[in-house]
A protein has these predicted regions:
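Register position in tetratricopeptide repeats
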Residues: 47, 81, 113, 147, ...
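Structural marker of alpha-solenoid helical repeat scaffolds
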Residues: 64, 94-99, 129-131, 164-170, ...
Length: 245
């Protein structure tokens, strides 16, 4: 489960933008959005498996902001997921600044698609040095390797994160760090290490169904049936139509 942004989607500001967008679509009325708002909406639809809706949000982004790098990168990733590699390369040529951070991640991802992991790793190493081991960069790399199911490389960057960050206090304040590490530990069958981060998140976002579901699954993996049932019951109490519980 990739729930890197799932807690952000609980934010009232995002919900307001989403409601405005969906009202525009339903009522066929024009509205203006910043590029970041529309890209977040596309990310939300992607997380929900609504890929056509995500593409429509990116279509509007590129209509309003035709040179926006993040929107172009999103479109390229969408084409890659559809195995339309040639079309993805054509869109990539529209990006003015290929040294942009997101473009470097895209280059690495395209190399990973071709099993050229060592070349992707070199891009990441240079990027991390350029950005002086910035936490968000390390988290992005961990998430990238987790998504690609590259446990060894993801683990090396988790070690790097722990070596360069205050991991005693940072998880208490950095929601994104908790989500990325949870995703890593859950993906690679280390549920006991994911559970503390899930509990921290649920203390802050007690109505996050995705995190209650994941907590239940982690307890199930450890045969902790009472705790699993309790977590899944919380998810059902929030939404009794929650099919993952």
């Amino acid at each position: 489960m990739n729930y890197d942004m799932s807690s952000y989607f609980e934010d009232p500001e995002f919900k307001e933008a989403l409601a405005k967008y969906e009202g525009m679509v339903e009522n066929h009325t024009p509205a203006y959005f910043e590029a970041d708002e529309l890209i977040d909406i596309a990310e939300y639809y992607t997380l929900k498996g609504r890929h056509k809706d995500a593409d429509k949000a990116i279509d509007l982004t590129l209509q309003l902001h035709p040179e926006n790098t993040d929107a172009l990168v999103f479109r390229i990733r969408s084409l890659m997921l559809q195995n339309k590699k040639e079309e993805a390369k054509v869109v990539a040529q529209l990006i003015a600044n290929s040294t942009d951070r997101e473009c470097r991640f895209l280059q690495a991802d395209m190399l990973m698609e071709e099993d050229r992991i060592e070349e992707a790793e070199e891009i990441f190493k240079q990027l991390v040095m350029d950005e002086e081991y910035e936490e968000d960069t390390l988290l992005d790399i961990i998430q990238d390797y987790t998504n690609a199911n590259q446990e060894e490389y993801a683990g090396q960057w988790v070690d790097c994160l722990f070596a360069h960050s205050d991991m005693q206090t940072l998880p208490k304040t950095n929601q994104r760090l908790r989500d990325v590490l949870c995703d890593y530990y859950s993906t690679f069958n280390k549920p006991d290490l994911a559970i503390p981060y899930l509990n921290m998140t649920l203390n802050e976002y007690p109505y996050s169904i995705e995190h209650w579901n994941e907590l239940g699954k982690c307890h199930l993996q450890q045969c902790q049936y009472e705790e699993a049932n309790e977590a899944l019951d919380f998810a059902l109490a929030i939404d009794d139509e929650n099919t993952d519980s």
